[in-house]
């Protein structure tokens, strides 16, 4: 209420300090004195107030708040006074005082010039009485706001201008607050004082005073003040990002109660330098709260402006802060990552699913979500974008797919995208369960074949199981023998014998209504046992089950009414009602209508008790001695157990009246020839039906041979009539009403001799016809057997059909899925490698096959698209054969198979890197040396291959195997199978020279493989070098032994009118007699040896494949020794080519012989392959050489040897065995000149066409030189082939360096030539060699 007015007294205070140094130094002072004594003074308005203050120190005046210091009516004068002018005096003059000048006036020492212990001020309250203004402040129109706090003192400041005025306090509208001196008190200086304010004082309060008959009022509005801060927020929300140079604006918003006031301030990194401008405002538009805003703004933000910004809010004792983080970037950026995994899963039916990414970007990019390449929000209204997330509402299976988020900041030209895959898992749903609406279960006829189907949809694909629940019977009266389900259940499979006999359980994928669904079918072979089948489908989301009540019935439609026969008056009426006991109960007979059409509807008391059988309940109705009145409509009534409905089955019963017998036609006399036949008819009617009896000559006729009685005895048939059959025949018809008869005489004509002749003729005819049909049947069977044998004999693999035909054997072979089945998900298919008769071979990567933890490259054989059932069966048969054969190192082995439903049939086999042996040997002709020593000194030389051969050198899979190519599959590549790309592997092995021990090793391994196949009773039938594959470590494997293919359907073997056969490799008995056996494979093995030791040469070079070739082969002609075969090897070939199959060696004997050639005294310890690296080296103590032979030896049938050694003394054998002396062998080189033409069959490696003599003769016209040897062919008296056979072959010998080079004929006299040992490559059977000089 007072204010200090001290500006004018400052000079006086300084002067006082100079004069009265003692007082200013802090000596004791008296308080100031006022000229008016007492605590108050009353004066009239318009008078002048003089108030003087005297003190010992400088002082100032404090005025009422209603008095302004700038008021012109107010003045203060100061002077020195007292004794020696040592005191300070000041006079306050107020001219023309008014009511608002009422208040407390005080004189107060200045703080610096007084002692704190003394009284510092003197005050007096001045009332300026004004009858027209009893209140100092008048608030009659607009109440003045008075803040209050509940529980504290409340002052209503209605101060008056005179202490004698009486004032009353009223609260709107009608309450009066009377002072009681305790809670409510009146003070003319302060107003009304309420000691402990409550919510009752809240409102409009009015002070009233009556002066001179006039009522004066002043109003106050109490306001309850609070300190409630409801909320503090900073926008934009944290973190706040800006680019350098932008304007930072932060808005701190405080929400409070209506009666709350706040103080707001900021703390931020640039506060010390006042980087920000701050402005505040209040929003009172909300009737329930106040909203205060404090806006901080920084222009051109810099890196130094980043940091923590804090908004501080204070209201009374309440204090709140809110922080936000500000980041300042030099340029924009976008970073997006998967929040979880790239593949997300959800469940169909979920209310919503959120697809979100971890996005860090500035400034905020534009966001677009795509589903399968289409904007998601356009695709469905269920999709909505929130921030960087896509919300999918009411998830369905159609929501599965690829979702891509597109982020773009155009001004920064920044764009990013990221794709996530959403898998919507669906709980299994059974289609039949949703569409089935039958009120009661169906019934299945006894003994019938039933097919139960369960169509299931779910993601992932559900597993379906069939269960059987046997019946548990309830023998209560209400539900007699009713079958109800039990908790006992049995899982079924195709071999289950629980309940009904199961024919099979199949499962397949079908597209139904555009959706892939799994259809499982249970086939019940014989319906006999009632119970319940359950189809249970489950996946990781859930399980669903469909119960199929399987009620067997022996009653048609489960309800049948039958009448035993139409009753006749006096007989018994028998009605039978049979119902299924699983569907009906409460069976009774009722009579619905009588014969006179009188409607009845009552039960029949004559019905018997119902009887229960295995499947039905029978209720019989028997009425004895029926009369015509018993006719009517009878009905059997039964109640359906499931629906409660009463079912009626009606039958009409008409009781017939008795009627005497009546013959429709009388018998008549007639004649019949002996040995003939005759028929007598006796048709009669009556009620009941008459019984007919036949008599001959009054003797009753019984049925016997030659005499046949027809139905109801109404017809008498006599066969082969004899003389004894002549006589009187009589028929009698009888029933309860009477008897009727008719008779006739039968006359027999002719004698018995004629009859015997006819009988003999008939017998002979029957015997002749029987013999004819027997011969015809045998002939047809022979034709069928021949056709079957031809078809069976040409299967690539033949399992000795000693007792059972091949097709039946293959059908009986088992397939062990637990051993061979491989998951398709762990198989990654690659490129196609080839196609066969009914299938194709593709390259694949298999993880974990044969329990390996690594990835292995394999070959997969599968059917072509659109394969037939027979082709599927053929491939399945091949798979069974491969599983039956088993594993061996020297065969291409089966690794696994994929046979389960839901995908194609796949057969997984090994692959071999280096292709077939034939092409490999051809490529090694320039790299061949006899032993390892020469090979170690051979200089590397790049092979020069023929263009067509180069193509063959690429690693490939022949028939069932393939080359490997690395395919990234996410697995570790199996180093034992594949170290590098196939081409690199071949380039490495191509640099290695080929030695004699390699050739023997190949021969030995093939023999071991064939020994294994023969032990498994398998016949290869097409053993050749092209069907031998080369794998790692010089291991060879036999292939093409497991393909169950019919060569008549193979384009490589079949031509209409001609028959393609691999004649060069076939044994004579196979060519002429179509007989295939292990011995015929031995013959083919001999041809294979010839291929190996000619380094891939074509068998029978220069020989035309025609009928003449076959004839000479049958006569004993054989191939000459190949270029690099020793006598021991050639002897083995001749043994394999023995004319008598029984004299040919077994494969076990061949293994032993070749093993002896490989290594002396080797203990094999069960190994399938003998390592050869340490054999035939210098350090082994053996020097492998081919012995020289005398000229006489070659005169005995051998051509010039290709092996010579420098000294015969150095020749030794490696575990050589003693051969029988070679007999004179005719070879195809001795053919007449007209029989052959030079090199015309060199290209026919795989098969030859056996045709008529008009077969074209193939010639090879390429003349590319292979070597520098040139010998002029000038012999005209011999054929080209004979000329070649008489030429001395190029020398082949050992050298220290191992080089191979041709020998020029003109250098034979060179003395230096003998010192340098050298060798020449074998002839290339794919090109013509020209000789420039005649033979010596």
UniProtKB/Swiss-Prot annotation:
The active site is at residue 1022. It comes from Rattus norvegicus. This is Vascular endothelial growth factor receptor 1. Disulfide bonds join 53-107, 158-207, 252-311, 454-535, 577-636, 682-731. PROSITE patterns: IG_LIKE (PS50835), PROTEIN_KINASE_ATP (PS00107), PROTEIN_KINASE_DOM (PS50011), PROTEIN_KINASE_TYR (PS00109), RECEPTOR_TYR_KIN_III (PS00240). It is a single-pass type I membrane protein. It comes from the Eukaryota. PANTHER family: TYROSINE-PROTEIN KINASE RECEPTOR, VASCULAR ENDOTHELIAL GROWTH FACTOR RECEPTOR 1. The keyword Ribosomal protein does not apply. It is found in: Cell membrane; Endosome. The second and third Ig-like C2-type (immunoglobulin-like) domains are sufficient for VEGFA binding. InterPro entries: Ig-like_dom, Ig-like_dom_sf, Ig-like_fold, Ig_I-set, Ig_sub, Ig_sub2, Kinase-like_dom_sf, Prot_kinase_dom. Its EC number is 2.7.10.1. ATP binds at residues 833-841, 861. Residues 23-758 are extracellular. Residues 1-22 form the signal peptide. The chain crosses the membrane at residues 759-780. Tyrosine-protein kinase that acts as a cell-surface receptor for VEGFA, VEGFB and PGF, and plays an essential role in the development of embryonic vasculature, the regulation of angiogenesis, cell survival, cell migration, macrophage function, chemotaxis, and cancer cell invasion. Acts as a positive regulator of postnatal retinal hyaloid vessel regression. May play an essential role as a negative regulator of embryonic angiogenesis by inhibiting excessive proliferation of endothelial cells. Can promote endothelial cell proliferation, survival and angiogenesis in adulthood. It is an enzyme of class 2 (transferase). One of its GO terms (molecular function) is growth factor binding. Keywords: Angiogenesis, ATP-binding, Cell membrane, Chemotaxis, Developmental protein, Differentiation, Disulfide bond, Endosome, Glycoprotein, Immunoglobulin domain, Kinase, Membrane, Nucleotide-binding, Phosphoprotein, Receptor, Repeat, Signal, Transferase, Transmembrane, Transmembrane helix, Tyrosine-protein kinase, Ubl conjugation. Glycans are attached at residues 100, 164, 196, 251, 323, 417, 474, 516, 597, 625, 666, 713.
């Amino acid at each position: 209420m007072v204010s200090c007015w001290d500006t004018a007294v400052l000079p006086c205070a300084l002067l006082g300090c100079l004069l009265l140094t003692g007082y200013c130094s802090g000596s004791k002072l008296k308080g100031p004195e006022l000229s008016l004594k007492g605590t108050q003074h009353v004066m009239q308005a318009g008078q002048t107030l003089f108030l003087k203050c005297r003190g010992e120190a400088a002082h100032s005046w404090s005025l009422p708040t209603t008095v302004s210091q700038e008021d012109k009516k107010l003045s203060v004068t100061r002077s020195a006074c007292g004794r020696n002018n040592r005191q300070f005096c000041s006079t306050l003059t107020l001219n023309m005082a008014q009511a608002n000048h009422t208040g407390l006036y005080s004189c107060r020492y200045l703080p610096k010039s007084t002692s704190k212990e003394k009284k510092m001020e003197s005050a007096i309250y001045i009332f300026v009485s004004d009858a027209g203004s009893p209140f100092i402040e008048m608030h009659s129109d607009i109440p003045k706001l008075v803040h209050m706090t509940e529980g504290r003192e409340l002052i209503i400041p209605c101060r008056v201008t005179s202490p004698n005025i009486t004032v009353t306090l009223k609260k709107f509208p009608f309450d009066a607050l009377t002072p009681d001196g305790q809670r409510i008190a009146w003070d003319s200086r302060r107003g009304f004082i309420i000691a402990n304010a409550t919510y009752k004082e809240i409102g409009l309060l009015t002070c009233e005073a009556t002066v001179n008959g006039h009522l004066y009022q002043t109003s106050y509005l109490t306001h309850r003040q609070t300190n409630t801060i409801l909320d503090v927020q900073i926008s934009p929300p944290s973190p706040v990002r800006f680019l350098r140079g932008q304007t930072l604006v932060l808005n701190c918003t405080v929400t409070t109660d209506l009666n709350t006031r706040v103080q707001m301030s900021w703390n931020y990194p640039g506060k010390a330098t006042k980087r920000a401008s701050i402005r505040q405002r209040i929003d009172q538009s909300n009737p329930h709260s106040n909203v205060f805003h404090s806006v901080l703004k920084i222009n051109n933000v810099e890196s130094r402006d980043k940091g923590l910004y804090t908004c501080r809010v204070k209201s009374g004792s309440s204090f709140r802060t809110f922080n936000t983080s500000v980041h300042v970037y030099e340029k924009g950026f976008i970073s997006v990552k998967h929040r979880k995994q790239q593949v997300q899963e959800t469940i169909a039916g979920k209310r919503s699913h959120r697809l979100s990414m971890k996005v860090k970007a500035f400034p905020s990019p534009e966001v677009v979500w795509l589903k399968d390449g289409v904007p998601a929000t356009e695709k469905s209204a269920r999709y909505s974008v929130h921030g960087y997330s896509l919300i999918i509402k009411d998830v369905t299976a159609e929501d599965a797919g690829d979702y891509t988020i597109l982020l773009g900041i155009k001004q920064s030209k920044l764009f990013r995208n990221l794709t996530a895959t959403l898998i919507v898992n669906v709980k299994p749903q059974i289609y039949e369960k949703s569409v089935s609406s039958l009120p009661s279960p169906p019934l299945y006829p006894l003994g019938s074949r039933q097919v139960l189907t369960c169509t299931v949809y779910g993601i992932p694909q559900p597993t379906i199981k069939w269960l059987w629940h046997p019946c548990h019977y309830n023998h209560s009266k209400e539900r007699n023998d009713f079958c109800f389900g039990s908790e006992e259940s049995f899982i079924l499979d195709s071999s289950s014998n629980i309940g009904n006999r199961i024919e099979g359980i199949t499962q397949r994928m079908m597209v139904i209504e555009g959706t892939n669904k799994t259809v499982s079918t249970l086939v019940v072979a014989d319906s006999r046992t009632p119970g319940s089948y359950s189809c249970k489908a489950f996946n990781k989301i859930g399980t669903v089950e469909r119960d199929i009540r399987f009620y067997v019935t022996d009653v048609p439609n489960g309800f049948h009414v039958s009448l035993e026969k139409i009753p006749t008056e006096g007989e018994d009426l028998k009605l039978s009602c049979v119902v299924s006991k699983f569907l009906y109960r409460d069976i009774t007979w009722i009579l619905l209508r009588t014969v006179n059409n009188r409607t009845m509807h009552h039960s029949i008391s004559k019905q018997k008790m119902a009887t229960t059988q295995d499947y039905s309940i029978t209720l019989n109705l028997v009425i004895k001695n029926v009369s015509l009145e018993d006719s009517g409509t009878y009905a059997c009534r039964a109640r359906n157990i499931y629906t409660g409905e009463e079912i009626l089955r009606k039958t009409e019963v008409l009781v017939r009246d008795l009627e005497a017998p009546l013959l429709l036609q009388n018998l008549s006399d007639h004649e019949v020839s002996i040995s003939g036949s005759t028929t007598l008819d006796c048709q009669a009617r009556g009620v009941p039906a008459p019984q007919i009896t036949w008599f001959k000559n009054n003797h009753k006729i019984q049925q016997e041979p030659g005499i046949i009685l027809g139905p109801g005895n109404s017809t008498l048939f006599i066969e082969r009539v004899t003389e004894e059959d002549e006589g009187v025949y009589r028929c009698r018809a009888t029933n309860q009403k009477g008897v009727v008869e008719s008779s006739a005489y039968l006359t027999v004509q002719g004698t018995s001799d004629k009859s015997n002749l006819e009988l003999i003729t008939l017998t002979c005819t029957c015997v002749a016809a029987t013999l004819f049909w027997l011969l015809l049947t045998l002939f047809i069977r022979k034709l069928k057997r021949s056709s079957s044998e031809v078809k069976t004999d040409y299967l690539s693999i033949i399992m000795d059909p000693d007792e059972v035909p091949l097709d039946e054997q293959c059908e009986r072979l088992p397939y062990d899925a637990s051993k061979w089945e491989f998951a398709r998900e762990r198989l990654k298919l690659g490129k196609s490698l080839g196609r066969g008769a009914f299938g194709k071979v593709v390259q694949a990567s298999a993880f974990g096959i044969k329990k390996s933890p690594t990835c292995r490259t394999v070959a997969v054989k599968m059917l072509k698209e659109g394969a037939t059932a027979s082709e599927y069966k053929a491939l399945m048969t091949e798979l069974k054969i491969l599983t039956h054969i088993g594993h061996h190192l020297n065969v291409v082995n089966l690794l696994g198979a994929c046979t389960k439903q839901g995908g194609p049939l796949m057969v997984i086999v090994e692959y071999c890197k280096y292709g077939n042996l034939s092409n490999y040997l051809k490529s090694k002709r320039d790299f061949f040396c006899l032993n390892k020593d020469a090979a170690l000194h051979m200089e590397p030389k790049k092979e020069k291959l023929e263009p067509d051969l180069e193509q063959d050198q690429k690693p490939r899979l022949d028939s069932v195997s393939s080359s490997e190519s690395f395919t990234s599959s996410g697995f570790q590549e199996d180093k034992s199978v594949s170290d590098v790309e196939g081409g690199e592997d071949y380039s490495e092995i191509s640099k290695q020279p080929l030695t004699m021990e390699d050739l023997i090793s190949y021969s030995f391994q093939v023999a071991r493989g064939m020994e294994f196949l023969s032990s498994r009773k398998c016949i290869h039938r097409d053993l050749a070098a092209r069907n031998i594959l080369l794998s790692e470590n010089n291991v060879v494997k036999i292939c093409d032994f497991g393909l169950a293919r019919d060569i008549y359907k193979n384009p490589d073997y079949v031509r209409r009118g001609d028959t393609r056969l691999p004649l060069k490799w076939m044994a004579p008995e196979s060519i002429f007699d179509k007989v295939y056996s292990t011995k015929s494979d031995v013959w083919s093995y001999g041809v294979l040896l010839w291929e190996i030791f000619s380094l891939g040469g074509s068998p029978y070079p220069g020989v035309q494949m025609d009928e003449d070739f076959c004839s000479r082969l049958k006569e004993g002609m054989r191939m000459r020794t190949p270029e690099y075969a020793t006598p021991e090897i050639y002897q083995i070939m001749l043994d394999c080519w023995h004319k008598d199959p029984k004299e040919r060696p077994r494969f076990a004997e061949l293994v032993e012989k070749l093993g002896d050639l490989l290594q002396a005294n080797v203990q094999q310890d069960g190994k399938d392959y003998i390592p050869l690296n340490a054999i035939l080296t210098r350090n082994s103590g053996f020097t492998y050489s081919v012995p020289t032979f005398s000229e006489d030896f070659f005169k005995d049938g051998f051509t010039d040897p290709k092996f010579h050694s420098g000294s015969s003394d150095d020749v030794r054998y490696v575990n050589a065995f003693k051969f029988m002396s070679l007999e004179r062998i005719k070879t195809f080189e001795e053919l007449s000149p007209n029989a052959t033409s030079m090199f015309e069959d060199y290209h026919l490696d795989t098969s030859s066409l056996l045709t008529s003599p008009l077969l074209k003769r193939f010639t090879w016209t390429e003349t590319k030189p292979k070597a520098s040897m040139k010998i002029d062919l000038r012999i005209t008296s011999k054929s080209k082939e004979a000329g070649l056979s008489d030429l001395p072959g190029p020398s082949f010998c050992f050298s220290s360096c191992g080089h191979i080079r041709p020998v020029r004929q003109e250098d034979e006299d060179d003395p230096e030539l003998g010192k340098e040992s050298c060798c020449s490559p074998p002839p290339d059977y794919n090109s013509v060699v020209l000789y420039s000089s005649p033979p010596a």
